């Protein structure tokens, strides 16, 4: 079934859908059915693509994700905008779909070095309900490509829920390929607090330099959201702690209370299976904002059985599964 847009009588735009095996009825061309699009609205104009306006993004996000598979109703504006800051969003190259002055769709894009290449990250793509299945998501993506190429961006990356098959197919048509599976887990705070203490391990604040010194200890490459440069993107919003054994740095954690986001948990290979990771997780409970009931560990490489088993032993349970998808620009 094809879809598209065409102009009807002055001031009215319609969406058409071609049904190859269906007749349109008397008086209507057989090749297409014309479905009037929001005719009840006055002064309807053809949506235009312009840069996303930061002050309109939150309202548009909440509308676009009001029926999303994961409940977004509790997302706060301050937290959403901080996440965009963490991901180095550039609103000037993030295309927005506007119906008049109203933002009804968007692809919000962050740019940073990741895996040895300047990379664009799709922080969020969303459309208000009346603007879906009309090809706008593809148009937004295509609109962003020239500016990204001018910036020297070599790759585009995104994450998508595995259950969102229509989105996966749409991304594949745009040239994206599945790079890996990502697991998202969640634990009750009470479970973290109840973790057993680890004797002989001193957990205390650490510097960004100390945290970066263990970067090579990572058993898998972090996703864009959890990249190590995040520690520099929002330094005042991240609590970095180190686990020390005999004065030697054995592991680090990085957690953002404002986002309730576990960014990094690393243990030196020489100190694994000694309770270092457990001590760091237990310590994170001291940073949690008041009223926080859950802590999530997001975007763990699906092939990292050891890491997944560790989180499982600490009381974490499956939340959702995602795919990381990439394409060259």
Could you tell me what each predicted segment is?
Residues 61, 65, 70-94, 98-100, ...:
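Active-site rim helix/loop that mediates acceptor-substrate recognition in acyltransferases
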Residues 13-16, 37:
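Tryptophan (W) side chains
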Residues 127, 133-146, 172-173, 273-286:
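Conserved acetyl-CoA-binding loop-helix of GNAT-fold acetyltransferases
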Residues 96, 102-111, 119-121, 126, ...:
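Conserved beta-strand in the GNAT
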Residues 134, 138, 162-180, 278, ...:
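Conserved active-site alpha-helix within GNAT-family acetyltransferase domains
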Residues 21-24, 45-60, 198-215:
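A short beta-loop-alpha structural element at the N-terminal edge
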Residues 148-159, 290-301:
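Conserved GNAT acetyl-CoA-binding A-motif
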Residues 159-161, 177-190, 317-328:
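Conserved catalytic-core motifs of GNAT/GCN5-like acyltransferases
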């Amino acid at each position: 079934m094809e879809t598209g847009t065409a102009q009807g009588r002055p001031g009215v735009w319609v969406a058409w859908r071609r049904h190859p095996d269906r007749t349109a009825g008397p008086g209507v061309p057989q090749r297409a059915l014309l479905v009037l699009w929001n005719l009840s609205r006055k002064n309807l104009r053809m949506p235009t693509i312009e840069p996303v306006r930061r002050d309109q993004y939150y309202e548009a996000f909440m509308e676009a994700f009001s029926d999303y598979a994961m409940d977004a109703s509790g997302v706060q504006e301050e937290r959403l905008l901080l996440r965009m800051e963490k991901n180095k969003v550039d609103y000037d190259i993030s295309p927005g779909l506007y119906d008049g002055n109203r933002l009804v769709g968007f692809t919000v894009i962050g740019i940073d070095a990741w895996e040895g290449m300047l990379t664009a990250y799709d922080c969020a793509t969303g459309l208000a309900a009346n603007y879906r299945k009309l090809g706008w998501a593809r148009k937004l993506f295509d609109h962003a490509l020239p500016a990204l190429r001018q910036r020297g961006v070599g790759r585009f990356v995104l994450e998508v829920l595995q259950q969102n098959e229509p989105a996966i197919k749409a991304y594949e048509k745009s040239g994206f390929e599945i790079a890996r599976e990502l697991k998202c887990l969640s634990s009750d705070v009470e479970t973290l607090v109840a973790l057993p203490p680890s004797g002989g391990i001193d957990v205390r604040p650490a510097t960004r330099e100390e945290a970066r010194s263990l970067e090579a200890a990572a058993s898998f490459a972090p996703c864009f959201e959890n990249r190590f440069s995040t520690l520099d993107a929002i330094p005042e919003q991240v609590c970095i702690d180190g686990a020390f054994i005999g004065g030697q740095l054995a592991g680090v954690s990085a957690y953002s209370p404002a986002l309730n986001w576990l960014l990094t948990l690393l243990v030196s290979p020489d100190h694994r299976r000694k309770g270092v990771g457990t001590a760091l997780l237990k310590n994170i409970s001291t940073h949690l904002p008041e009223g926080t009931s859950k802590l999530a560990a997001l975007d763990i490489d699906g092939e990292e059985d050891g890491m997944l088993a560790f989180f499982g032993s600490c009381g974490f349970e499956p939340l959702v599964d995602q795919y990381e998808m990439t394409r060259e620009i």
